[in-house]
């Protein structure tokens, strides 16, 4: 089990949190690229998947519920896992946060189920909340698409803005690629979108430029 440990001096007003596998991958990309004045966090039910990320703050969701083995592509497990860690999530967001970006790949268990829980806490705290999510490739099947649609409907209840990236559109742009390459493009686009918006906000709004 990974220990939740919030750095004492880390309290930027803009935070980016990656939820689940896709969201965590995107935030890892962003962290490696580097954005000043933004705090990065990843949270997942899959403890092993988080270990390889250089992002310094990692929150394992639902350790008691899942045993660190993931949500099994079941959104209700992702939701209940986030509810298990409500106080930890709140502790992250309460430290002077003015704007929150939530990145997630929808269609699986953790991103789909946990992202709306995090968004609801953010809304409750009066934080400007932006969701940036991907929806599955068609070849991933009808069930994942239905899960993604449910996740979008839940997120819309709590976020101030929601950017939806359709993975099938990426296939149209990049053509037929190996499966790993296709998912890599999805992570890259998710990362680029969040990074671009966060940088615009950081430079033009909060710096007073």
For each predicted feature, which ranges?
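Tubulin/FtsZ superfamily GTPase core signature
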Residues: 1-209
């Amino acid at each position: 089990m990974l220990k939740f440990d919030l750095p004492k001096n880390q309290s930027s007003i803009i935070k980016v949190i990656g939820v689940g596998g896709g969201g965590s991958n995107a935030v890892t990309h962003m962290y490696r690229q580097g954005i000043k004045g933004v705090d990065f966090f990843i949270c997942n039910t899959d403890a092993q998947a988080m270990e390889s990320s250089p992002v310094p703050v990692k929150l394992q969701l639902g350790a008691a519920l899942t045993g660190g083995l993931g949500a099994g592509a079941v959104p209700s497990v992702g939701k209940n896992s986030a509810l298990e860690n409500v106080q930890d999530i709140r502790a992250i967001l309460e430290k002077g946060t003015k704007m929150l970006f939530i990145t997630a790949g929808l269609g699986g268990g953790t991103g789909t189920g946990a992202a709306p829980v995090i968004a609801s806490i953010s809304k409750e705290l009066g934080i400007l909340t932006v969701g940036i999510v991907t929806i599955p490739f068609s070849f991933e099947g009808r069930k994942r698409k239905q899960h993604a649609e449910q996740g979008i409907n839940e997120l819309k209840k709590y976020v101030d803005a929601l950017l939806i990236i359709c993975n099938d559109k990426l296939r149209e742009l990049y053509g037929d690629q190996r499966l790993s390459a296709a998912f890599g493009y999805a992570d890259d686009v998710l990362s680029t979108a969040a990074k671009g918006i966060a940088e615009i906000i950081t430079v033009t709004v909060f710096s007073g430029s």
